[in-house]
Each structure stands twice: as C-alpha cells, then as structure tokens.
C-alpha cells in the first residue's frame, strides 16, 4: 500500500473511508504486508508522519518496505533514486519509519537467477525457444555476477544469491535487512512483471526448476497492472495461479506472504531452505470486507 498518489491511482488517501477500512482490515489480517514507499506525491517528512500516525492510530503494523518507481521517499539512492535515508533532505524519514517497525527493505535489486538461498546457477535463464532474448538476459545476469564479485555495491546481493542481507541505511542507525527479488522471465527482469503477463512467468519450466533447486523466490511483479481497460485477470494469469496452486497442494512449493518468508529466513540466516523445519503458520483467511 502507498499513501500519496496522483488522482486516478489507487492509494490510501485517494479512496473512500469505507475502502480505507478495508485496507486496514487486510493489513491486520496479513494479506497486505508491504509499505510501498509513501507514494509519488510524498515529498516531505510531514507526508511520512501523516501516514505513520494513521497506521498507528488503527493498530496497523507493517514490517516490509518496498521502494516504488522513483518516489522521493524511496531508500534506494541508486536504482530507485530515493532520499528517504538522507538526513537533511526534505524527504528523510528513515528514523521514523524504522521506529514504526520496518525491518526489511527492498531497494530495487532483482535477479534472473531461479531460486535463492541456494548456490548461484545461471542454468535455466537461457531458453532455446527464445534464444536471442534469453541469451541477452543471461549476459546481463553474468555481468551482474562479475560486478558483484568485483565489489560493486549495486550488486552486492547478487553474488551470494541470498534473499536477505544485513544492511545499514545511509546516514542512519537502522540495522535490518535488504532483500532480493527475482523475475525469471526469459526476456529479463522488467518483462511481464504484471498481472497481465505473469502467466508467462509462472510456467512449468520455472516452477520445476525452482523445486529442483529447492530454492526460495520473492517474485518481482505488479499484479494490479492488468492492461488498458481491464479489471480482471486474463485467462493466462488465472491458469498460472491454478498451476501454482497445484504445486502447493501437491507439497512441492510453499506459497506464503513476503513478510512471513522474510521472517523465516531472518531467523535462520546461516542455513538453506532444506535445513530447517518450517514453522506452523496460522492459515491466512481472507476477511469479510
């Protein structure tokens, strides 16, 4: 969820009080678990204060921060061009946001590698059905790996291929985690990362490779982007989610929320996904809205 957006964009302040209550219900139930910056129009610390006071007032707790586009309140100053952790900047808010409870931040890092928290492998990126495009994607990922091993800060997360890494925000005392997301589409991390195109991502090829590697994945996607004039998922997307559900119900893939997965790995930092017992999680039941 985000707060300050232009007219026509769904956000907390742009909707009705009835819909805001629905948002709060979904935060409390755990279905909405990420703060997606404070929005495109949030340019000052005061905007952050207003949003955090609203969340606090209604008992809504979020632990995950996800940078959005190039919003001023983003934490990532390189890819996402944010200023949220720059003391002295009008958009600085890191101290307030961390005090509120944010523990995990995403600052724009995305990989094409299928499966994290297992050894780095570029196998599965190249696809002979889309040879030229997939080889281009493979070359980009190889470049990230080389730069990461040369100490390039932008790609620090890529070399170990771990979902989480301890991080300190620039100019702030925040001791938390930065996390890595993945989009395994053959044409690169910015392809079909939408509700319209996710059917081209959640393929049998990807799911089989993920299960074979026994890895983890926080998928990079924007499910609300359905294409011009569309209000529902298309048939390809529906079939993709049914496919994922089949893998879940057959015990091959654990499907969970971002916050739950990050909590799991932060509590088991030194081991791989196959080395620890999965916790007992209360079933997420969609609330009556």
What are the language-model segments listed below?
Residues 190:
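His/Asp/Glu-rich, glycine-adjacent segments
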């Amino acid at each position: 969820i985000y707060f300050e957006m232009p007219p026509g964009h769904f956000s907390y302040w742009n909707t009705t009080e009835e819909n805001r209550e629905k948002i709060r219900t979904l935060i409390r139930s755990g279905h909405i678990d990420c703060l997606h910056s404070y929005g495109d129009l949030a340019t000052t610390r005061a905007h952050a204060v207003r949003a955090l006071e609203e969340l606090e007032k209604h008992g809504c707790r979020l632990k995950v921060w996800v940078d959005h586009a190039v919003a001023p309140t983003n934490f990532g100053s390189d890819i996402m061009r944010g200023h949220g952790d720059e003391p002295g900047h009008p958009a600085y808010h890191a101290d307030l946001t961390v005090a509120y409870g944010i523990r995990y931040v995403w600052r724009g890092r995305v990989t094409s590698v299928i499966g994290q928290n297992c050894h780095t492998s570029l196998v599965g990126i190249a696809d002979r059905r889309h040879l030229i495009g997939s080889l281009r994607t493979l070359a980009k990922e190889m470049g990230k790996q080389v730069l990461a091993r040369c100490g390039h800060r932008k790609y620090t997360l890529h070399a170990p291929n771990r979902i989480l890494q301890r991080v300190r925000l620039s100019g702030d005392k925040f001791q938390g985690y930065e996390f890595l997301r993945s989009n395994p589409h053959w044409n690169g991390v910015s392809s079909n990362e939408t509700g319209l195109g996710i059917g081209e991502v959640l393929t049998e090829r990807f799911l089989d490779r993920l299960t074979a590697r026994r890895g983890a994945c926080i998928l990079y996607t924007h499910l609300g982007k359905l294409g011009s004039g569309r209000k529902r998922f298309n048939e390809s997307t529906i079939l993709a989610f049914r496919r994922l559900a089949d893998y879940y119900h057959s015990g091959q893939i654990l499907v969970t929320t971002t916050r739950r997965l990050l909590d799991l790995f932060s509590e088991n930092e030194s081991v791989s996904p196959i080395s620890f017992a999965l916790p007992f999680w209360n079933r997420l039941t969609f609330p009556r809205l």
